[in-house]
Amino acid sequence: MQAEVRIERYADQGRCVAHIDGRVVFVRFALPDELVRVELDEPHDRDDRFWTGEVVEVLEPSVDRVTPAWPLAGPLAMGGGVGGADLVHVSLPGQLKWKAITVSEQMSRLGHIDVAVPIERMPGDKAAGGLNWRTRIEMIADDNGMPSMRRRGTHNRVAIDTMPLATRTLLDVAKREHVWEGGFEPGSQIRLSVPEPRGEIVDTAAADDNYAVLVDGELRAGSQLLTEQVTINGTTF
């Protein structure tokens, strides 16, 4: 079932709120004030407290809307659906606004504290376009043994040959360890973890080996023990 709705406000999990005949609908890949056409998730019953759905067409876009930097993670109707990037359709300033409003609303609703919560980007994030920040990724091998991700709401696996959200260090490890070349048993769980150095790296040799590639829980490359390091106000932890 499809419906045309006016999006009202931000919600959680990268969704926004709209109403259909008085019922709350949580909509993926939408933005406040937009007029969109939504495909409702099945099943949806009239007795349900709320419905969920996803944008299939944007009739009146928000100024904060952008073309998804990673199309595979965008709406199903636009060739996406692999998940992992809930705000892929939102500009960088729009993402900050979304998060600031959401956190402030939760502080008010749960903590009864009315305060505007500032949200700031980490150094270098703007230059990276909001990408290259994940230090861990998980995939599943498709029927051809290639790393893939499941399309949302299905068992379909979509082969991938990169992960734009992953740090450049993680992507370098994946390339060096031939992860994108496949050769895995179909259905295998593939996990990569590469802690990102923050602050001064004291032991460079240890940092070079500070990663793990696991297949079905077994270490294929790297180290069993990983070290996370961060420097705050001059103190390294």
Residue spans of the language-model regions?
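Accessory RNA-recognition modules of RNA-modification enzymes
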Residues: 1-237
